[in-house]
Amino acid sequence: MSEINSQKYKKLFQTVCEAPIDAPKEAFNLHDWVFTLSDKDYQTTARGHIGAGSSIHTDGTQTSVNVESVGGNLLVQHYVAEVKEPDYVKMVSMSDLWLMKLVHVVVKVTWEMRLISVSDSECKFQNTVLVEHPNFIMKIMSALALGGYFVRKHNEEETPLFAENLYKRTFKENT
């Protein structure tokens, strides 16, 4: 186990955003959607999305690799799903982060997506991003660099576009 994995993490920031979907949550499968999201679709869901792909390790573990720029910082995320349900996916990544594209650090990013029933014919897509690091200095650096602000703005941009993509892909494939 690497040194960073054995340390206690401190929350740098967390953001939760929601977007309405005009269909019941039972119509969707978040796990299938996120692991079949094409590179092109990923790029259309936020200005900072550079590329994405998924693969399967030799041990059978499914992974999703996302490359994005948030607030001038470059992230390469190596997500592994911890929970894979049709209406809830939780993925964790030990992400490579280049602060201002210069200083390399590794942060733990937890990405959770949920579908929450609103009525028999509607649900909402909830997108949660949690960024953690074991060193308190990173919390100070993140605050000084307005990291929480930029991650929140990024989440506000991508959440409705993820919901729209989920809806379009689900109903296009089912027709």
Predicted regions and their residues:
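Hydrophobic ligand-binding cavity/cleft-lining segments
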Residues: 1-63
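Glycine-rich portal/gate segments that line the openings of hydrophobic small-molecule binding cavities
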Residues: 50-102, 169
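Short amphipathic alpha-helical segments
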Residues: 22-29, 33, 150-158, 162
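Residues at beta-strand starts and edge strands
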Residues: 11-15, 28, 61, 89, ...
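Beta-strand/loop substructures that line and gate deep hydrophobic ligand-binding cavities in soluble
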Residues: 98-157
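A short, structured loop/turn motif at beta-sheet edges
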Residues: 23-28, 82-88, 114-124
